[in-house]
Amino acid sequence: MSKRLLRSLLSLMVCMAMLLSLAPALLAESADAPSTEMAVGAVIHGFEVVENGEFALLNAKTTVLRHQKTGATVFFLINEDTNRAFDISFVTPLSDDKGIPHVFEHSTLDGSKKYPSASLFFNLIYQTYNTYMNAATYQVMTTYPVASLSEAQLLKYADFYLDSCFNPMIYEDESLFRSEAWRYSL
């Protein structure tokens, strides 16, 4: 694995861990009440608060944090909506039309160290209390969004996505990648 990719993955992992550790304290605050802990310039777990703002369309308060060592960025949004969401995204620019980032998107969700079941993603989609769960690959990025009305469930989904992204079973079982990547042309 290249140093650049490893550094990017580490940045995202640190970013998401920090976001999850802040969530309970931030969610306890009212959307209208300013948080003294989130003042611009404050440093929280190695992340500097670089901007506070509002997103009028969603009647939301926003905070942008940047990790001092890695440059990873966290965008935190809080409003009165009871539907909670989590997303982890990676820059995955295409170098050709072979669809390799899309194959990795599928392979990533075919089990992880903590969640070794290859069918767990589909079980989570159809048999749990989520309001949205998916993964998508675009020309420049791959994203793994999930939403739920239950904060406890959302944290479990986030844990599943994080472990799938950073500890995928494809390292242990190369056939998972091959089963997603095979192609037959006439």
Task: Walk through the language-model features, giving the residues of each.
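Short, glycine/charge-rich beta-strand/loop segments that flank catalytic centers
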Residues: 124-126, 138-143, 173-186
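Bacterial N-terminal signal peptides that target proteins for export
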Residues: 1-13
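Sec-dependent signal peptide cleavage junction
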Residues: 19-32
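N- or domain-start disorder-to-order transition segments that initiate the globular core
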Residues: 36-80
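Bacterial N-terminal signal peptides
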Residues: 11-21
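M16/MPP (pitrilysin/insulinase) zinc-metallopeptidase core fold and M16-derived inactive scaffolds
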Residues: 78-157
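M16/insulysin-pitrilysin zinc metalloprotease superfamily fold
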Residues: 111, 147-184
